[in-house]
């Protein structure tokens, strides 16, 4: 290996490490959301539809709302929804999409990092987050924080990627960010009763490629 080859490989690894770090930090998402290209489909996440359709609409908090697809769906079902994300550009996109969808009057927006989330005394009938994956197993701490925002009689819904051979191309930091639903149970206080704790298979087609993966799904209800 020549010095030039080694340097080129080192630069590639450095760029990859930086990209991985950016994936978990606000700056990386601010950059992604700064352009005009739509990143997500805008469709609601399927486990949200499955679990929430039968609930009585009230107030909802969607943490890690991105471009607002789940927020808009909830608002259309009659919920009053707060979309929360650590990206100001993402929140701006979500607000525009809500306006275009005709549900701006049922939505509001909150810039917050889930890793340091404090509900500041606010509670919601539904607290939900989908595919939020803080690094190094940090989801347990995030769930502990989200629990504080669940009103008496309210629900917490957490959905994420379960470890799967589908994700073999990702690095170890991404793998450590994945979780199974059972791992989150330690974050639930006694008055939050698990309703659903499972990995649900889902077939996804993106860019013409179809893969099978599992959604780690935790639904819990607070007594009261």
Where are the language model's segments positioned?
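A short glycine-rich, Lys/Arg-flanked "PGG" loop and its adjoining helix->strand segment in the class I
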Residues: 140-152
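Conserved class I S-adenosyl-L-methionine
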Residues: 2-55, 58-66, 164
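Conserved SAM-binding strand-loop segment of SAM-dependent methyltransferases
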Residues: 102-114
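A short acidic, Gly/Pro-enriched loop at the edge of an enzyme's catalytic core
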Residues: 115, 119-126
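Conserved beta-strand signature within the Rossmann-like core of class I S-adenosyl-L-methionine
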Residues: 153-161
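Conserved SAM/SAH-binding beta-strand->alpha-helix loop
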Residues: 87-89
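A short SAM/SAH-binding and catalytic strip from SAM-dependent methyltransferases
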Residues: 125-139
